[in-house]
Every structure is written in C-alpha cells, then in structure tokens.
Amino acid sequence: MAEQLALVIGGTIGGLLLLLLIGASCCLWRRFCATLTYEELPGTPAMATTAASSGQRDRPCQPHARTQLSRPPAVPFVVPPTLQGRDWVPLHSGEWADAPWDPCPASELLPHTSSGGLGDACMVGAINPELYKFPEDKSETDFPDGCLGRLWFSVEYEQEAERLLVGLIKAQHLQAPSETCSPLVKLYLLPDERRFLQSKTKRKTSNPQFDEHFIFQVSSKTITQRVLKFSVYHVDRQRKHQLLGQVLFPLKNETLVGDCRRVIWRDLEAESLEPPSEFGDLQFCLSYNDYLSRLTVVVLRAKGLRLQEDRGIVSVFVKVSLMNHNKFVKCKKTSAVLGSINPVYNETFSFKADATELDTASLSLTVVQNMEGDKSQQLGRVVVGPYMYTRGRELEHWDEMLSKPKELVKRWHALCRTTEP
C-alpha cells in the first residue's frame, strides 16, 4: 500500500515538473520568434555612395549595418525609422508646416525604383506636410457684388451664470459714404432696442480690428427667443452716426450647443428706410429647384406688427401654406417669438412641387399671434404666386424666382388683413 502511494505522489510531482518545463520552453520560443519577426535591413551601396559623394552627414534614418542577415536580402519590408523631435510651426496662410530640422535624407539622395525596393526604405513613415494643409479660408477675400461689408464675431453662453458673452472681432470691406471710414458698432439684444452696448471708434479704416468683449445678462429660459443685432456706423467729422449696415443673429438652440465659443461671420444688410405698412411687413426668400422639384421658402423677419393687447404672454409665429387651385396642400409653421413687434425667424421650409404645377400653385404666409388659451389672432397675410392669384410686388417676386432657378430671391412684402383661407 505504501509503495502504491509513493508511486502516485511521484507520478504527480513528475507530471507537474513536466508541465512547468513545457511552459517555460514555450515562453522562450515565443520570445525568440518575436526578435526575428522584424528587423531593419542595411542600406544599399548606392545610398552610401551617393551620400558620401554629396558630403552629407550621417542621418538618423540610415539603419545600422550588420555583417550577417538571418533573412534573405530580398525581403520587401522594413521597419520605418523613428522620427523624434519633429516640431510644427504655424504659417500666416492658416496652414501648418514642420520646422526646418530634417531627420530624413533628402528625396534627391535616395534612388527611386518602381519595384518599391530598398531605395525607398528611409521614406517609409515620413510625414508629407502637403497632405495636412488646412482648407483655404476665402471669407476674407471673396465678397459678393454690392457687399456692404462683413463682420466677424463670437458667441458663447454661460448656463450657470446666465451670461451671454459676445466677442466683436473685426470687420472688412466696409463701404463708407466718404473717402475715409471711422466705424463703430452698437450691439442690441432684441426685442429690447432701448439699451445697447457700443464699441470703440476705429479711425480711418475700412477694415477695423476691434477685439472687444461684451456681456449681456439674460435668462436661460428666454435666450433662444432673443436676437443679437449689430449695427455698424460711420462717425463723420461732426460726430454724426451714419448707418453702414446691420447683422441680425437669432440665438437658436443649435447656436449655444457646447461649451466652447463659436466664431461666426455675416455680411451686412441695409436697413429698410421705408416706414412699416398699416399691418406690418414680412421679409422672406423664395427659391425653386427644377431638378429636385422643390420649392423653398426662407422666413426671415417681420417688422411693425400690430399686436393685439393681451394680458398673457405675447408670441408671434408665421404659417406658410402651399395652395394649388386655391385648395390647401400643405402647411408648415415657424417657432413662436415672444414679445416683439419686429420678430426674427430665419427658418427654412421646403415643399414638393412639380414644374407643371407652378402655374396653378401659390404660397400664403400668415402672421399669427397666440392669444390666451388655445386662441389665436391673424395679424396679416401675404400671397405670392402666378398671375392667376397675384399682382404687383408679389407677382414680381414669383416671376423672379422662376427666372433664377436654385437662387434665393429675397424681398419685403406688406401684410394685408384678410380672413384665413
């Protein structure tokens, strides 16, 4: 019995030792194979001869020579050289390039072969700055015909402090009424047009650099209903302010997404000097894409609205309806803007309309005020379409849209009081 027990114990110990020996052998074999998986190949004689004849120093990309190789000399793979200390410096054109230090041989010193042999070995892994250029920014060079100027600014909203941070960066291509231009900018947070913040006056320049920062205290509940307005003026010798143009920027939800500030540029628009119509005016764009059979309407803003007195919160929206043979086809609505007789929307809507339907189709844009409860009140309406339904400016707007396919045609229209179709 004792002999059998001794045999069992001896067999168990022997088996464990055998397993340990096998495991150690496997580990050593894997390490040995890993050292032979990749290895750098020596430079070709052509490389050495060329480098010596040109008087160049030894460079970090040249591999160390070895007397014996464990692999055939025709292996078409080498380990790319490690590039260290590579610095990048910014260029004035908005591109980035590496510093002058060159850790690799010049391309003319390396023989080039179509078979991808050892002559291209040192170029593997090198960075080509041409592949990492930033796209050219044409916002400072491309100005449309009749441009009044362009304004750059930044917007950031601090949710916890309920502060709107506005950065006035610069303006370019300002069109002054005289030879010299001395611009300043007034900032409003609509619908409040009584209070404003003002920049410093820049003397004798049509391309002023402001770099000023302004703070508006505004609640997070109403921030998406506000509109940032920039009015750019020229200050003449009598210190009178002459309006050069303005920019309206609605603070929609997508504008304030994220914690970082957003840099924007906008072209200046001329302020309409015509007095508001009896029931107010509505500005919108029309465009038709004949290839996609798509009719696009961009509701921009309204002015001089006759709001109905109401104890509740006043909000105004625009309803856009597509009609065909005076029959309702489809309707879309803008978001409601609170407490302003000059609301700004900047919202785009698209309708499906074949080219054969445009002779009988029309668009009805109705400005509606929300009342207490579920009630609403029409403030005014404008209809644009072919000769069958409209005349005057409304017909001209429709015809201009058809004559300029795929272009946005913008116009003001007077609202008229009429019953809803």
Swiss-Prot record:
The keyword ATP-binding does not apply. Keywords: Cell membrane, Membrane, Repeat, Signal-anchor, Transmembrane, Transmembrane helix. InterPro entries: C2_dom (IPR000008), C2_domain_sf (IPR035892), Synaptotagmin-15/17_C2A (IPR047897). Residues 30-421 are cytoplasmic. Gene3D superfamilies: C2 domain. One of its GO terms (molecular function) is calcium-dependent phospholipid binding. Residues 147-264, 278-399 form the C2 domain. CDD domains: C2A_Synaptotagmin-15-17, C2B_Synaptotagmin-15. The chain crosses the membrane at residues 5-29. One of its GO terms (cellular component) is plasma membrane. Residues 47-68 are annotated as: Disordered. The keyword Zinc does not apply. Residues 1-4 are extracellular. May be involved in the trafficking and exocytosis of secretory vesicles in non-neuronal tissues. Neither C2 domains mediates Ca(2+)-dependent or -independent phospholipid binding. Homodimer. This is Synaptotagmin-15. It comes from Homo sapiens.
